[in-house]
Design a protein with these regions (language model features):
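Acetyl-CoA-dependent GNAT
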Residues: 1-38, 49, 55, 106
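Residue-level recognition of the GNAT/N-acetyltransferase active site
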Residues: 36, 40, 67-69
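C-terminal "cap" of GNAT-fold acetyltransferases
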Residues: 67-71, 79, 89-107
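Residues forming the Rossmann-fold NAD(P)(H) cofactor-binding site
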Residues: 42, 46, 50
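Conserved hydrophobic/aromatic "anchor" residues
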Residues: 9, 20, 75-76, 81
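Conserved GNAT acetyl-CoA-binding A-motif
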Residues: 56-69
Length: 107
């Protein structure tokens, strides 16, 4: 796929990067979301997800979704995502981890 199909957001405090997220625009999938641990619970993740959802909505995407770790489930619920059934997800490394598919229907 072309890089133009992806949208990346970098959150900064001052000039210091504190988090980032990436969205596959055609599918509405949040591919990555990371916030530095020392900035967790300071609204950084919410700002990043809000921007990714805004971009998806502007592109005509109807559903934004992701595969969330069990630790991230509560965060995604807080920002308006609905959880699916817990399942295993195979990482590129081949390791399987427990996860929860999450989705947010855009109005």
């Amino acid at each position: 796929r072309l890089i133009s199909e992806k949208h990346a957001v970098v959150a900064e405090r001052g000039s210091v990067p504190v988090g980032f997220g990436t969205l596959d625009v055609p599918t509405g999938e949040i591919l990555q979301l990371y916030v530095r641990p020392d900035y967790a619970r300071h609204g950084v993740g919410t700002v990043i997800v809000d921007e990714l959802v805004r971009v998806a909505r502007a592109a005509g995407v109807r559903v934004v979704h992701c595969i969330a770790s069990l630790n991230a489930r509560a965060f995604y619920v807080t920002v308006g995502f609905d959880p699916g059934q817990r399942r295993k997800h195979r990482l590129r490394s081949g390791v399987e981890v427990d996860c929860v598919p999450m989705k947010k229907v855009l109005e």
